[in-house]
């Protein structure tokens, strides 16, 4: 009887999916179903990624075009942009005041660069110490180790960087290089990770991989000169979401059932860069389109039938008094993830958490500014380094006082 009911429920769900499916849904299903087939599977699998990116792009095209048109029609927009970029150091200092010492804030900041940061990728990668290190059992669970050749004798603080990509692209290539190279130059050990993505790996596979990387670092990073007792995590866009969620769900059994018993997935600090922090809210057209994208591509379940999945995946709903220190960075003119996401998240953190919460809102900056905007990227990477170094010093000082 139970088997009949299960079969009936499956059949009803299948019919319901057929009735609401669109052409892109069929392409995604074809790619996922055919990806494991011999011979042709490897050719069908990329179709899912391309389709998923297309679905994501279609949902943001109108916002992007609207913002672009508004800019073009705004008198004196070039002067406004110049002034916004010139204010990066000033707003960064203001955001860190009270968190970072005045002496550290007074040191010389990086000069703005004219060329897009992506053009300097090779220069940053001189700090890559080891490539394609496995952090899990799956061949896709890879990381690069960034560090100086002349490491200090004592264990170095560690940063795990989680790249973005709308939860359908999780490659460590290009992303985060300015932050990784700056911290590596200062003696940190940095781990830049890949993780598995939709549509072939639906949620919560993404966060499970991030948790696996954290547990791996806690157990193994000392082999590369890192301090297993200080692990920070940072990420941009989808990686910002994953970093925040990881920081707020330390050792949550829901997200580490696959890990060995006793694995430690806690982190000591979080930096979220233009991240998405709410998977539930559908109060605006933009947010409703985003949830629809999650339902169709990332989660592959509906929020009406599985509200707990979307709630549990929302960092804004997971904030507790014991949250680690946070630095949240967002551009005021982000048309992919509107800045209200960051503002609401920071408000929640400051109301609940006992730890320090920094918020750096960059005037005029858009999504992905750290790849395209040389005037902002250097100072922002410097601000992140100041924040993380301060958290590390405070933690070390506290440990000495306890001893």
Swiss-Prot record:
- Annotated EC: 3.1.1.-
Q: What class of enzyme is it?
A: hydrolase
List the keywords (alphabetical): Cell wall, Hydrolase, Secreted
Active site annotation, chain numbering: 237, 334, 367
Query: Main site of residence?
Result: other
GO molecular function ontology, one term from the record: triacylglycerol lipase activity
InterPro entries with a match to the protein in the record = AB_hydrolase_fold, BD-FAE-like_dom, Carboxylesterase_B_AS, GDXG_lipolytic_enzyme
Biological process annotations from GO: glycerolipid catabolic process
- One short Pfam name that applies is BD-FAE
Catalyzes what? a fatty acid ester + H2O = an aliphatic alcohol + a fatty acid + H(+); a butanoate ester + H2O = an aliphatic alcohol + butanoate + H(+); a hexanoate ester + H2O = an aliphatic alcohol + hexanoate + H(+); an acetyl ester + H2O = an aliphatic alcohol + acetate + H(+)
Identify the PROSITE patterns for this entry.
CARBOXYLESTERASE_B_1 (PS00122)
> What Gene3D superfamilies does this protein map onto?
alpha/beta hydrolase
Q: Where in the cell is it found?
A: Cell surface; Secreted, Cell wall; Secreted, Capsule
Give the GO cellular component terms, alphabetically.
Answer: capsule; cell surface; extracellular region
Family note: Belongs to the 'GDXG' lipolytic enzyme family.
The entry's function note states: Esterase that can hydrolyze short-chain esters with the carbon chain containing 2 to 10 carbon atoms. Does not have lipase activity. Is highly immunogenic and elicits strong humoral immune responses in both HIV-negative (HIV-) and HIV-positive (HIV+) tuberculosis (TB) patients. Also elicits pro-inflammatory cytokine and chemokine responses from macrophages and pulmonary epithelial cells. May participate in the progression of active tuberculosis both by contributing to the utilization of lipid substrates for bacterial growth and replication, and by modulating immune responses.
Q: What is this protein called?
A: Esterase LipC
State which gene encodes it.
Answer: lipC
